[in-house]
Design a protein with these regions (language model features):
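Surface-exposed extracellular loop regions of Gram-negative outer-membrane beta-barrel proteins
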Residues: 1, 76-95, 107, 133, 144-146, 182-190, 194, 279-284, ...
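Short acidic/polar hinge/loop motifs at secondary-structure boundaries
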Residues: 1-22, 110
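Short strand-turn segments of transmembrane beta-barrel domains in outer membranes
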Residues: 6-8, 24-27, 37, 41-71
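Transmembrane beta-strands of outer-membrane beta-barrel pores
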Residues: 42, 55-59, 85-89, 116-118, ...
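Repeated loop/turn-to-beta-strand initiation elements of outer-membrane beta-barrel proteins
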Residues: 49, 76-79, 89, 120-125, ...
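Flexible loop and strand-edge segments within Gram-negative outer membrane beta-barrel domains
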Residues: 88-109, 115-182, 188-206
Length: 320
């Protein structure tokens, strides 16, 4: 339900790196991607600095504060606490069209991360807890939410979102086979949004669970790798547009296999596929192909092809 807000729910100071995939995504990551994927890697507790403070202010009344606390709990456990707050307090209409250039906003975002790392037995794990509260108001410059909501005096909108996330990731690298690993990911979140756009009201509560088990190894040598595994998704939507009820449940279970060839020089190939069973879409297969070739040092040719299947969430994805 948060697709329309993209990375605005992930503060920039939390991000260690961003990976962008163009074209059909990896079969490992699900059956939906066809035009690309964005993955954000958050700063890890191990290796982070003990304290970080960042403050930002601009002439258009956008203010932001970021604070990171990092501590080593033991030889194998580390923890980080990320605090983020931002607000926009003043109205602006630089182009004089009668509407706000940017929404009035207020956000509180808290993340607590724990990392376990045991080099002796090859075990690493992450536990994440996050709470988000986000409020936005937009519309005409003269809109007053206390006076004009539910009327035709001035057009306005409010979007109030509360979100809770819990995720875990456990990885194991086989001690005598460093190229062989096993990973298990779980994520649970509750997204609760109350909003209105003019005279139209839109409320949605989404409860989601995602689980992914993946095994990585090689075939003969490290130029030939493969990944295989299982995953399960569950989404419960309690969605209302005015008095219309669009509540539903989506769940799926799937299996995937992906082969990678990489000569560590000028050519790599990823060939994969998955089979999934969805409670509303049925059983289907989604193949994926990626190829990369360097004909010379400063040139890269890429090719990707694949099939995807997706259950659209048309109201949440097309919010103003």
């Amino acid at each position: 339900a948060s697709q329309a807000y993209g990375l605005s729910f992930t503060p920039g100071t939390w991000v260690e790196s961003i990976q962008i995939t163009k074209g059909a995504g990896s079969a490992v990551n699900g059956y939906e991607s066809i035009s690309g994927q964005i993955n954000t890697e958050l700063i890890k507790p191990i290796g982070d600095i003990p304290f970080f403070l960042n403050a930002y202010g601009s002439t258009d009344s956008r203010f932001e504060l970021n604070t990171h606390f990092n501590t080593k709990l033991s030889d194998k456990w580390s923890s980080s606490l990320f605090l983020h707050g931002n607000t926009r307090v003043a109205k602006s209409d630089m182009n004089n069209d009668g509407f706000l250039d940017n929404p009035l906003a207020k956000q509180i975002n808290v993340l607590n991360r724990y990392q376990y790392y045991n080099e002796e037995n090859g075990l690493v794990s992450f536990i994440n807890f996050r709470y988000l509260n986000d409020e936005k108001q937009t519309g005409e410059l003269d809109f007053d939410k206390n006076r004009d909501r539910g009327t035709t005096n001035n057009w306005g909108s409010e979007i109030n979102t509360e979100r809770l996330d819990l995720s875990t990731k456990v990885g194991y690298v086989f001690k005598d086979l460093p190229y062989q690993s096993l990973g298990f990911q779980n994520a649970f979140n509750i997204h609760n949004q109350h909003s209105y756009f003019g005279l139209n009201q839109y409320n949605i509560k989404q409860s989601s669970y995602y689980s992914n088990l993946i095994f990585n190894s090689i075939i003969s040598n490290t130029m030939n790798k493969f990944a295989t595994g299982l995953n399960f998704t569950y989404d419960k939507y309690q969605e209302f547009v005015n008095v219309n009820d669009y509540s539903r449940i989506d769940n799926s279970v799937g299996a995937f296999f992906e082969y990678t060839y990489d000569n560590d020089d000028d050519f790599s190939l990823i060939l994969g596929g998955r089979i999934d069973n969805h409670n509303r879409l049925g059983t289907f297969v989604t193949p994926r192909l990626h190829a990369r070739y360097n004909p010379w040092e400063k040139a890269v040719l890429r090719f990707s092809a694949g099939r995807r299947k997706r259950s659209a969430n048309i109201n949440a994805e097309n919010q103003p």
